[in-house]
Amino acid sequence: MTKRIDSSLLYTALVVLLLLGVVHRSNARPRVNRPPGFMRFISNATDFASEDYYDYIIVGGGTAGCPLAATLSQSFRVLLLERGGVPYNRPNVMSHDGFLTTLTDVNNFDSPAQSFISEEGVPNARGRVLGGSSAINAGFYSRADKQFFENSGLVWDLSSVNQSYEWVERAIVFRPQLRTWQTAIRDALLEVGVHPFNGFTLEHKVGTKIGGSTFDRTGRRHSSADLLRYARSSNIRVAVYATVERVLLASSPSVSGSNVSAIGVVYRDQLGRFHHALIRDRGEVILSAGALGSPQLLFLSGIGPRSYLSTWGIPVALDQPHVGDFVYDNPRNGISIVPPVPMENSLIQVVGVTEDGAFLEAASNVIPFASPLHSVFIRAPASPLYVPVTTIMEKILGPVSIGLLRLASTDVRINPVVRFNYFSDPQDLERCVNGTRKIGEILRSRAMQDFMIREWFGNRRFRFVGAPLPVDQSNDLVMADFCRRTVSTIWHYHGGAVVGKVVDSDLKVIGVNSLRLVDGSTFNISPGTNPQATLMMLGRYMGLKMLRERMR
């Protein structure tokens, strides 16, 4: 009976809010997104020859692949293969307000976001569009933390790192304009002691800061695909709707000691026709297909544990026991509330970085509300009711818990199977408990008072959507249970082909000539509060490094 009354009150309240104009939606029409000038070297894979030769073949036009291709094209002939389409003709992808729609409007064929569910049952997504996940994410931009560079397994030229970040930032990074919810979160973080206030900065710093955004002031998205503007158009070709089936490998005894070499790739176009792209002398195949796609392609190309590949009937080119191992995903936990005040769509702009390994972020969205109740007094509205929902979330540093990726099929279009083993390491659980406790402090701050509803006799409370924080937040066991029950993803999964196990310090696949991985599959830790800045930097950084290698 109580639940029925509460649902009825919620529905009535929403109708009243609508009549008062508190619940609202943006009436702005999507901007007309004119194709950028570099579209002239982007073509459907159906337009490509059945066989052609290139200096570099990059598989995956995503967050790292686009800047890598643009850089290498300055001196060499480059082919960039993307399994999805272009983002510029998709208003929801290109719009700040289309973020949630892009993540939920998915199919098995060509949607910009491809959904998958981990074996734990946590829904997730991967990019399937030029620009990769940088074209479907929340747009937050922040550089990596010091710990990432120290523990990555790579020897970094920090001067080149900074120059590569700046190269990205000049093109696609903007200072966000804080409005109601993000301003309140900034004030709340400072009130509960997440100090100091670092203002607007792209650097990773302990305290509270305003980060960069890949959405401009008009709400238009700028993804890594925009970095193709830097490409030398006479040296680059980009094929969209090009699904790479496998890397072509050949036996080739060499001075390096490896007797297997990559010589090209096989890809399929939308009509089902196969194409062969082959590399010239001293060329390379580079996998930039992401933490799911790159390990999957290694398996399908015959690189992986011998006994495992044999069970799938895949001919073994290289017995590599660690492909698909050391997979990680940063768990996200938090709460959502329906505020009693007008609210805008805002994605992550402010972050609180705590000393004990928690990153605190927030977002607000105006979403359609569908009531399960029917009333003879209220006719179905011509348009849906829209409800503001605000969220406070925390992501943990690391993580330490290790997962596993394996094939679900020999069809590359089918997502691999992945288990992230969230909170299997006690250190991750401890960090989550600390982070969710800090969310509790934020909710009790003065800055959050305006987001509580007023009840009879002067009482005030939050109207939660989904699970609220436990009442007894001092109890470690209760808080740990909350972390496990409410775990979700922040889409920062990585690993599966990590440095020192599958690739060396130059990101070359150990035991294979002319094959390199440049993407998040090589990471053993997520960089900073959001990995996209570092992945784009990595594409530029490795491109410059490879150009220097060829000049020797």
Swiss-Prot record:
Reactions catalysed according to its record: (R)-mandelonitrile = benzaldehyde + hydrogen cyanide
Residue positions the entry lists as glycosylated: 44, 162, 259, 434
Required co-factors: FAD
Keyword annotations: FAD, Flavoprotein, Glycoprotein, Lyase, Signal
EC number: 4.1.2.10
Posttranslational modification: Glycosylated.
Signal peptide: 1-28
Keyword Glycoprotein among UniProt keywords: yes
Organism superkingdom: Eukaryota
The keyword RNA-binding appears for this protein: no
Protein residues bound to FAD: 55-82
GO MF terms, alphabetically ordered: flavin adenine dinucleotide binding; mandelonitrile lyase activity; oxidoreductase activity, acting on CH-OH group of donors
Family label: Belongs to the GMC oxidoreductase family.
Annotated PANTHER family: (R)-MANDELONITRILE LYASE-LIKE, OSJNBA0019K04.7 PROTEIN
Quaternary structure annotation from Swiss-Prot or TrEMBL: Monomer.
Protein name: (R)-mandelonitrile lyase-like
